[in-house]
Amino acid sequence: MATDQLIHDLYAEIVKIPLIDPHSHIDPHRPTARTLDDILGYHYYTELAHSAGMDKALLADAPPRERVRSLLAHMDRFDNTVQYGWFLEIARTFLGFTGERLSAADADALWDAAERVFARPDWESEVMRRSNLEKVFLTNDFDDPLTKFDTSRYVPCLRTDDLVFRLDDPQVRQRLARATGEEGRDQVSLQRAVRRLFEHFTAHGAKACAISLPPDFVPSASGPGVFWMLAEHCREFNLPFDLMIGVNRCVYRNGVTQGQDLFDQRTSLIQYAELFNAFPEVTFCVSVLTSAQNQELASYSWIFPNVVTSGHWWYSNIPAYIEQDARARLQAVPKTKQLGYYSDMYKLEFGLPKYNMYRRVLAKVLADDFVRAGAMTEGGAVELARLLLRDNARRIFRV
Amino acid sequence: MATDQLIHDLYAEIVKIPLIDPHSHIDPHRPTARTLDDILGYHYYTELAHSAGMDKALLADAPPRERVRSLLAHMDRFDNTVQYGWFLEIARTFLGFTGERLSAADADALWDAAERVFARPDWESEVMRRSNLEKVFLTNDFDDPLTKFDTSRYVPCLRTDDLVFRLDDPQVRQRLARATGEEGRDQVSLQRAVRRLFEHFTAHGAKACAISLPPDFVPSASGPGVFWMLAEHCREFNLPFDLMIGVNRCVYRNGVTQGQDLFDQRTSLIQYAELFNAFPEVTFCVSVLTSAQNQELASYSWIFPNVVTSGHWWYSNIPAYIEQDARARLQAVPKTKQLGYYSDMYKLEFGLPKYNMYRRVLAKVLADDFVRAGAMTEGGAVELARLLLRDNARRIFRV
Amino acid sequence: MATDQLIHDLYAEIVKIPLIDPHSHIDPHRPTARTLDDILGYHYYTELAHSAGMDKALLADAPPRERVRSLLAHMDRFDNTVQYGWFLEIARTFLGFTGERLSAADADALWDAAERVFARPDWESEVMRRSNLEKVFLTNDFDDPLTKFDTSRYVPCLRTDDLVFRLDDPQVRQRLARATGEEGRDQVSLQRAVRRLFEHFTAHGAKACAISLPPDFVPSASGPGVFWMLAEHCREFNLPFDLMIGVNRCVYRNGVTQGQDLFDQRTSLIQYAELFNAFPEVTFCVSVLTSAQNQELASYSWIFPNVVTSGHWWYSNIPAYIEQDARARLQAVPKTKQLGYYSDMYKLEFGLPKYNMYRRVLAKVLADDFVRAGAMTEGGAVELARLLLRDNARRIFRV
């Protein structure tokens, strides 16, 4: 940073923008970590440690404090990764860590610091404030009661993977019946069930519907598809539909929890052309998994009024791909149609390092491609960042 | 620019190279804009404005002056894009605009300036001179009479999409019959028709045959394909064949005119292996739509003597992709086999900003990858640029 | 280099790391060039010259000294390429060339210098020393006797393309029968043959099994596949399995020798999911041909403990793709699971310029993404480079 004053200055302004985080997995009843294990239990650490040779038994069966020590002991195998960088930033910013590198020798001090810090009565608000997070979208199961949390801070979002891909599962049927009074065994019952879910969610402040989709998924109006029905209800209930396109579940069958999913690069947004044409009133906030498909996303969003670029997802959420993908979007997609970033986090503490990673890349792209190229003033670049990090989300999701 | 002296110096030399523009949609009888509506009617502006929320009615039915005002009013939604940058450069260079950003408030002044400037008797020559354009290739319908224009300045090129993809259309049949005296209903008649078209075009100075192709197109020697017949005539008549690979037409069905086409990234040049093998005497000037397929293009051009890289097309025609794609080509493809850029323009005024965009990227790549890396002198880098912008086109198209 | 002190300093340290080169085509009985024709006969030069218009007859039938002169005469058509850069570096470093550019006028002087230099009795050791090469892996035919060379310097590797793809060829059958006493006409005989090959190779110091695979290959446990059998023997004999994924053979049918192969970008590592799951004990060192598939590779290696990233192969072995691909791997894949580079060379003289190309890119990425970003000290960055260039290969291949 220090080597480039313009990037430094832009970054300093960008971090002041209060964030609307349009996609996370936060549990609003337990939004922050309680122990260091809640931090290092994040699948990025368990899967990287396992991938680098750590035995699954050490990960699964150990008591939390020992699991953390083992993870720290394995970190020297993946301390090159950005995910390690996120944790280092958490340790430094929130836990007072002052060393250069983390190792098993830091386990006790970090554990104790975490216990102390995370137990503060105002910890949740402090994390929000220090991370400059204003609103955080959730990912709620369809049968979530959505009660007992502040929906102006934690914005509900109807996650629909179970409805589209697991409705054959008796447990899912039962959950649907309990939530809606409908078993959804025929089109009429299914229609009624979905309608009740949308009524329930919008009554409780939901601002989006969301789903993750495998690479070979092709939405279609023909056949008894739940997916198409969801799009119809998004239209009726005025909800944007988050499409997270491209993930194959359980590719590595013996992987750690949440560390089993991968993808097939051979997928195309052309599979969604019929959908985008059929629902001009629905805003589709699209995430893709690969940088190659990002070129499709930038192009489809440049052409379709109802297609919006959304964040930098999972395997594309590293600076090498964020930089290339964000550059293309900023050069080709109307600035009002870009949701710059979302955290995808499970615990609030990750908002800060993840957004900082994005904001550093964004400052660099704005400096190189816009301010230095003479296309924008510094002030103009910061206003553009404000759209990406805040104002577009407010307008698109009506929050 | 100013921040990097070497890039600045290279750019200053590169802009002095007189351009051969090997692909445009210029109407030689009306090559320049007559009103500002001819500029802002370019599909890049109508599609971006529509994508950013502008009603199609405002675009289709409004009187030209009002349409321009509406477009300018919507520009603050896409003033981050390079296409906005092209227009800003036109306004500054040709229309005397001196402000920072364009808005509806500039509509009258720009309209009047355009009316005044575009009406100058020497405007066509002035644009050519100030843009440093020497020759501009056209894209002519097969039944274009090719008369009453200077074919040494505007080089005819036989566009063959209609013949390959729309020969079932009675109107196309009629046009073919009128142009050639043949209806093309059997192989013999079709052969005669195609031969007459090639005779007509080459007699009128045509220097290339061109076509755009969908992602799933696979040329084949078997079956009664017009495409294969065209390649045979390119061989016989000594014409390079421009292949623009990868576009799906009318994906966004309700899009504005020319703002409906997109693509499927899942396409490969392996589909053209049989063609490239069958016609070693024909030079294929290949454009691709995606940066991922650019790696295929660079590799196929590195191996096949008759495959030449051509320009940066459409959704790849933004600096983020031009830079990566040009770098790969410059590092891997013989320098004599690269057509650096073409304008794809409908009005001459766009030559300047589009080529400037390319020349800025080219200066940067030459500075970073060649001059600073010690692989070339500044003079050598400028000579390389001269091949890309001028000399390769002259040799390959024999102009 | 000189323009950036940090990159310069990192590079200076990185070149001191003794190299383990995990993949080459060196003939251990004739590891160095004997004439300049051995250098310029490398397919990169013959295919680029041919692609740029050089007649195959000049390449195939000419006496060596004339062929070299002709190649040099054509070099001004591809002196922009990195491959030209490798040769220029060889000429300067080993042959005393002091000029700016190479041409036919240099043919005699270079030929004579090469004759003199390559004939030195200690030339092989001198090249190894000046290139800082410690061990070089070979690519041995399955019936290679593996005798009369120093297997601690030249590490045998069982190349299995013939077994998997050409077992129907009577010549291959015969070679198999001679090498193993088995014709491999049924599963039992084939099992025995493969076992004997593994016994022979491991007894002679082989440290890997390797194969190159077409884009549509899908390994499967069902059916009488030799490939699956090889993986089983890798498990039993404790050998890593190098998978070089994505090449189509003989795409350009009239190309020069080894200058005929290309690829289809439409391939995915999902095709290997069953394999990776079935053999957790086998380390798969995976090379891919495209930068788009590199994102898959980085992701699969991040998740699967037994998938390791390996080098920058063929059409991806140019700085534009090395930089992007290496950045992604360094940000996302545990550092212990990356084989940074291999030479793929046929003559030892190419180790120096090829590794230097990689080391320059690596120094730049380490400077920009790690040291300047504050994520690593300079010393830490050099230690990371040591893993990529040496220590990971030693651990993974047990050398």
What are the functions of these language-model segments?
Chain A
Residues 253-256, 280-285, 309-311:
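Short, flexible active-site loops
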Residues 212, 242-248, 287-289, 310-312, ...:
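Generic beta-strand/beta-sheet core signal
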Residues 208, 214-271:
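Acidic, glycine-rich loop-and-beta core segments that form the ion-binding/anion-interacting portion
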Residues 276-292:
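Electropositive, surface-exposed helix/loop patches at the edges of structured domains
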Residues 148, 158-171, 253-277:
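Extended hydrophobic/aromatic segments used for targeting, binding, or gating
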Residues 261-271, 288-295, 318-322:
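A general structural motif
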Residues 2-237, 282, 298-399:
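Metal-cofactor-binding active-site regions of metalloenzymes
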